Amino acid sequence: MSPTTPKKSAAKKTGKTPAMAAAPKVLLDLLNACGPSGYETAPAAVWRDAAKGFAKVSTDVVGTPLALVAPKHDARSPARRLLVMGHIDEIGLIVTHIDDQGYLWFGSVGGWDAQILVGQRVVLDTRAGKVTGVVGKKPIHLLREDERKKVAEIRDLHIDIGARDGDDARERVRIGDVAVIDAGPVELPNGRLLSRALDNRLGSFVALEAARLVAEAGGAEWELAAVAVAQEEITFGGSRTSAFALEPDAAIVVDVTHATDAPGIDVKEIGKHELGSGPVISRGSTLHPQLFELLYETAEREMIPFTVEASARSTGTDADAVHISRAGVPTGLVSIPIRYMHSPVELVQLEDVYACARLIAAAALRLDGDATFSR
């Protein structure tokens, strides 16, 4: 669907999106942190520290940080609980073998297009600190004709850390150490940001920012539990355990989706979601219709531009795990359009990020203490 056309007006209680948004320090710190699935300690610490100023903070054994924003003083007791989550892990690489020449062989953590990896500089997270390497393969000059036609596979690639031999490499790197591509955030013109790990440090930032906006407004009728869930790219582990432990009365998941204003993307398949068109509200079989309507109506009331994305089956996000937790959780999904997903050069319009946080905060503030999502 086409985005709604907003009038020039600040949203009540939930802040105002800057005309030409800049990247906040906490988002840049999140993007600079190394945190593939299962190894999210560094970005989780950034997120947790940022939440301490306005929420009660903790971390579970899976590695998911939680920020609880208390309901306003005159809210019904006990208050209902809204869970807002965005996963904080990223795709990465994991060392599976170190050969006697000192080359590191690796597997993928999450879904990679192997062609993207060739020639990339990487940073390995080891017990001794950061180790720099490069993903290598046989040079094109030495490839046979049949090899030149073959698409690169991860099993054909290795990481070179400049080791003299296997012993030298093993002194610095262990089996099971992880790596990410060395591609930190770069602010581009027109309020755009380029980085690896926008999928989904953006979602974790939005959950954090929405919680901050609700706290700044004095709380909502519902308690708000914001989480930056671990392990989405591999198992949905963080969302499964968080939804089970927190027993929310409703949930809103924040992730990224494909921006369709890049070459080669068919809007007939996934809809029209351009950079700058605002958050993308999902509607589909696994998502609760009343939460969709709440988000849709809130966006219209707050004059926030948005688009709608249809999801016929599963969404490929944490929403798939949350909505079937325990006896079921009414779940909504809001996404941020980005270009070049699962690459080191993901690209976003920062205004969309701020607008997404504003939308979720405004929806949380609209929830009545007696609201139910029965069908």
Q: What is each residue range found by the language model?
A:
Residues 1-375:
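N-terminal hydrophobic/helix-forming segments and targeting peptides
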